[in-house]
Regions:
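A ligand-binding cleft/hinge motif common to bilobed small-molecule-binding domains
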Residues: 134-151, 202-203, 230-265
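Acidic, polar ligand-binding/catalytic clefts
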Residues: 107-181
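Extended ligand-binding regions for polar small-molecule ligands
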Residues: 37, 94-98, 102-103, 172-175, ...
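Bacterial lipoprotein signal-peptidase II cleavage site
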Residues: 33-47
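Periplasmic-binding protein-like
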Residues: 162-170, 241, 249-285, 307-320
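Extracytoplasmic small-molecule ligand-binding "clamshell" domains
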Residues: 47-134, 294
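A structural signal for short loop-to-beta-strand junctions that line the ligand-binding cleft
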Residues: 60, 92-93, 143-164, 257-261, ...
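Bilobed "Venus flytrap"/periplasmic-binding protein-like clamshell domains
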Residues: 89-103, 135, 164-221, 236, ...
Length: 320
């Protein structure tokens, strides 16, 4: 909470609690003295906290008063967001959330949900925003279902904060000649449900000739997909480059997977916010620009080794 809420406590109430056992004359004197002292302290505290949360006034009042932004996130997507060994939520998005929260004077509270339910949670107001390596697309902006093409809601606005392409990975030493998406025709791929990789696999399968479609198995999260590939239940997997690269680096001590081919479909990750809440959208954009300018953004991106996806400025609805 920012100090302006502390300042709402009146000097009279503060003085009364500290002088309840003295006589009437002493009470009057104490009210004056301690009241002035408390007001001075509040101003000092307020100045310090406002300087630490310079963009608090940009938030909608209800969120500012609550002191919390509820974030819908699929917390099984390392290194973007995941649970460490202690059960703490860590990753690129939580670190950025902490930095944005300092600018806005609120806590970013990450709530776990499967990826394909996050926008629904935003529509139902379960979340204030969704932050989960979500690609900013025109369909999502306009509330159009990626698979059916049907309108399913009012859509969302995105504040874009990172750029990532889609990668293919295979079991290490067993790439089966897979270098491009066309090489997957007649083979099986595992993906996370509702992602760009899932959509791309379906689109590429339609291009396959001779009846050799891509067999696609989708899962609630990438870790489940990786488990299936690791056990030999598929020929390849696909996910956003930061996630695929992290899996290649860490799974089995770097012995399980390898990246194949080049990234495709490079597009922005966006923080999704209801179109009915432009005030929150603009506050998030201002906070993101602030941490880009002060260098905190670059520190976080470098910490996770994904500098190639960094952006130089926040952008609203930059996806295509």
């Amino acid at each position: 909470m920012t100090a302006r809420f502390i300042c709402r406590t009146t000097a009279g109430k503060s003085a009364k609690s500290r002088t309840a056992t003295v006589g009437a004359i002493a009470v009057a004197g104490a009210l004056l003295l301690s009241g002035c002292g408390d007001q001075t302290k509040s101003k000092d505290e307020g100045g310090e906290k406002v300087s630490n949360a310079p963009l608090a006034d940009k938030l909608p009042k209800d969120i500012r008063d609550a002191g919390v932004i509820k974030v819908g996130s699929d917390i099984a997507y390392p290194p973007v967001e995941f649970k460490d060994k202690s059960g703490k939520t860590v990753g690129i998005d939580p670190d950025l959330g902490d930095a944005l929260g300092k600018q806005l004077g609120v806590e970013f509270q990450f709530d776990n949900g499967t990826f394909d339910t996050l926008l629904g949670g935003l529509r139902s107001k379960r979340y204030d925003l969704a932050m989960s390596a979500m690609t900013d697309t025109k369909n999502r902006q306009e509330g159009v279902d990626e698979e059916t093409g049907k309108k399913i809601g009012t859509g969302v606005d995105f504040v874009d904060y990172f750029t990532a392409g889609v990668s293919i990975y295979t079991k290490k030493g067993d790439d089966q000649g897979i270098k491009t998406w066309s090489d997957l025709c007649g083979k099986k791929i595992v993906v996370q449900r509702g992602t760009v990789s899932h959509d791309l696999a379906k689109a590429e399968s339609k291009k396959c000739k001779g009846g050799k479609k891509i067999a696609i198995e989708s899962f609630d999260n990438d870790q489940q997909a990786q488990t299936r590939l690791r056990s030999g239940g598929a020929d390849a997997g696909s996910s956003d480059f930061p996630v695929a690269a992290y899996a290649v680096k860490t799974s089995g001590g770097g012995k399980d997977f390898e990246l194949v081919g080049e990234q495709v479909e490079a597009a922005p990750y966006g923080i999704a916010i209801s179109k009915k809440n432009p005030e929150l959208r603009d506050a998030i954009k201002a906070a993101l620009d602030a941490i880009i300018k002060n260098g905190e953004y670059d520190k976080i991106i470098s910490k996770w080794g994904v500098e190639d996806g960094s952006v130089k400025a926040a952008k609203v609805n930059g996806g295509k």
